[in-house]
Amino acid sequence: MSITENESQEMLGRSELNDIEAILSITNTDVDAIQHIVKDNADAIFTWDYSLSRPALRKLYEKAKVGQWNATTDLPWETVVDEEKQVSMDQAALSSGLTANHYEGTVMDKWGDKEWTAFGIEQRRWSLSQFMHGEQGALICTAKIVETVPWYDAKLYASTQVVDEARHVEVFARYLDEKLGGSYQINAHLRMLLDDIVNDSRWDMTYLGMQIMVEGLALAAFGNMQQMTTEPLLKKLLRYVMSDEARHVAFGVLSLQEVYKDMSDLEIKERQEFAYEASVRMRDRFMSQEVWERMGVNPRDVVPLILRDPTREVFQQMLFAKIVPNCKKLGLLDRNDSWLRRRYEEMGVIQFENAEDTGEEYVKYELGETLADVQH
């Protein structure tokens, strides 16, 4: 059963999933702002129980301690990055399947190699900028988890993730500044999602929004770019970040599995709806409207074509390769008459449900392991 127009309006702010006008109406109006303030509405919790009663979290904590790396000394920052040459080599990945032939009859139909190369550079700059902003969101949310989670084991692990996230913001900011010559402001859809995650007072919603949804999509997106790029610094940077990121997603799976099994159907329905809203917002941000605007193209002319592009559709579906099996592991897909399963069927991403969940898979991402057996 599909959700009604009223339900969609209440959750997404629009009656139809692919309402282009509604998607594009959400823009970042304060592009010159340096700071953004969000109320976090949560209590800090001390615990006087210092027993380590969750072996899976203890194992994760130990792996985090030995898996640390130095962003300054462990990456080859001396690498010279030729933007135009790199874009030409990585064009398929950079344009995410968008080709000139697909835009026959539009302004892009007249684009030559120069314009498509410029688009590729801007697309990479935009993608890495959103990674950077998302990592700062993770930095803030994980610091919140340290404060709000009631378990000693979880506080210990979350503290290591705070350090990881600081390192991730550092490497993306440095790469954008030194190798790509600048960055983009945060996409409005991503900012709204981060605001909702920080604003919610319930500690498990911070986990769900950040560890499962944002970090889960990031892990898949990093894997896609790491697999496609031939640029050695970026390839190594992403590989190192992924080794941390997999632990972060596993942290969410291992923690929430314990919590959700005892929740009522009403409580689970709230989590299902939040997961769906987060999924749609993350999908919407990959329309790259800021890139099209910078290239002098009206996004309203191109977004309908993006939504119909089969190669773009495959790319966007792959971004959910981690989220869907993890939601299944948490029991979110099939509670309440399979409500979330039906939403993911409508989004065309349910095919990933039987992939290995990150709570089991994370060890395959450790530095020194090959990624050949990991599904991106």
Model-found features: residue ranges?
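Terminal targeting/low-complexity segments that flank the catalytic cores of oxidoreductases
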Residues: 1-141, 147-155, 178, 182-185, ...
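A structural feature that tracks compact, well-ordered secondary-structure segments
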Residues: 139-145, 159-160, 219-225, 237-240, ...
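Carboxylate/His-rich catalytic cores and anion/metal-binding grooves
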Residues: 151-181
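Active-site-proximal alpha-helical scaffolds that flank and shape metal-associated catalytic sites
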Residues: 174-246, 270-281
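Short amphipathic alpha-helical segments with heptad-repeat character
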Residues: 129-132, 136, 159-162, 166, ...
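Amphipathic, well-ordered alpha-helical segments in soluble domains
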Residues: 134-141, 168, 214-221, 248
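Helix-loop elements that line ligand-binding/catalytic pockets
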Residues: 237, 249-259, 276
